[in-house]
Design a protein with these regions (language model features):
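Structural recognition of the beta-strand scaffold that forms the well-ordered cores
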Residues: 20-21, 28-33, 59-63, 70-71, ...
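Loop/turn elements at helix/coil->beta-strand transitions in domains of secreted/extracellular proteins
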Residues: 13-17, 55-57, 65-67, 144-147, ...
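Short helices/loops that flank or line small-molecule/ion binding pockets
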Residues: 1-10, 55, 164-172, 189-202
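Append "and occasionally in soluble cytosolic enzymes with long acidic Gly/Pro-rich linkers
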Residues: 50-172
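Extracytoplasmic/peripheral linker and loop segments enriched in polar/acidic and small residues
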Residues: 57-58, 62, 66, 70-73, ...
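Ligand-binding clamshell of periplasmic/extracellular solute-binding protein-like
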Residues: 1-2, 22-28, 203-219
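Extracellular/periplasmic solute-recognition and catalytic clefts
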Residues: 1-39, 73
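Short helix-loop capping/hinge motifs at secondary-structure junctions, enriched
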Residues: 36-56
């Protein structure tokens, strides 16, 4: 791209004027759909059972390396996209000047961001949770690889290129024997054609920018049983999940989170 060309050429007239600008209050995440439907309107039982499993989700957390995908957003400094929190760095500080996300990082016992590798990744834990998930989910009738439906705008080459990079990230990180990403398309409206009918397995790069700088405004979007919780009502559909022995742990996790918020 022109930006990369300028960055790599110290003699370029614009090189010394490049300044990286990060969002001030917006935070984007991956949002799972816990009540996914097939295109015929029936529940996608294989996906819904898999994503309700804690070990399955943890294998993604510890194993999914998105650094190549981030380059589609920031080719010069892809690790500037790394954010392991609901809020973005710079939203709010304590009285002694400590960034709120630093407090969360310490509570999560995550290493400091280093700009070289994703700090949440742990290959040993990822493999441990992968094998645990395969064992538990196979017993529930889940078939592998679990298929993840990922929708992009039709006839959009940039979106297709990014989706192919994301697909490769899944292949390299989790293995084609475990999860495969299906690239599907919508015609004009992702909301009307995909999100509202609940056809997506997960949404990438969807998030929130609160009207006022309070972490609770971000956390509240994921609460359970609240029609005004944006993520819950519009992205992950946790309130639509039927309680049973396979989903109760997932629901209990959301209930506990809601009580904490």
């Amino acid at each position: 791209s022109n930006l990369t060309t300028i960055y790599n050429d110290e003699n370029n007239e614009f090189h010394d004027y490049l300044v990286e600008k990060l969002p001030t209050k917006y935070s984007w995440q991956i949002h799972f759909n816990f009540a996914k439907n097939n295109e015929d309107g029936t529940p996608d039982t294989n996906w819904n059972t898999a994503i309700a499993n804690e070990a399955f989700r943890k294998s993604w957390y510890y194993g999914l390396n998105l650094s190549e995908y981030w380059k589609r957003t920031n080719a010069i400094d892809p690790f500037a996209c790394e954010n392991n929190f609901y809020t973005m760095k710079g939203l709010v500080y304590t009285s002694d000047g400590t960034d709120y996300t630093e407090l969360v990082r310490q509570e999560l016992e995550l290493p400091e961001l280093n700009g070289e590798q994703i700090v949440r990744l742990d290959a040993e834990k990822a493999e441990q949770y992968k094998q645990q998930a395969i064992e538990e989910l196979t017993a529930l009738g889940v078939t592998f690889p679990v298929e993840m439906d990922y929708y992009i705008a039709a006839a959009n080459q940039v979106s297709l290129d990014s989706a192919n990079v994301l697909k490769q990230c899944f292949s390299d990180s989790l293995g084609d024997d475990y999860v495969t990403l299906n690239i599907l398309t919508y015609v004009s409206s992702s909301t009307q054609e995909v999100i509202t009918p609940r056809l997506h397995s997960a949404l990438f790069g969807y998030g929130w920018g609160a009207d006022y700088g309070d972490p609770q405004n971000y956390l509240g979007q994921e609460t359970y049983g609240n029609d005004n919780a944006y993520f819950s009502a519009s992205y992950n559909y946790i309130n639509e999940v039927e309680a049973n022995e396979n989903t109760q742990n997932l629901i209990d996790t959301f209930v506990t989170f809601t009580e904490m918020v």
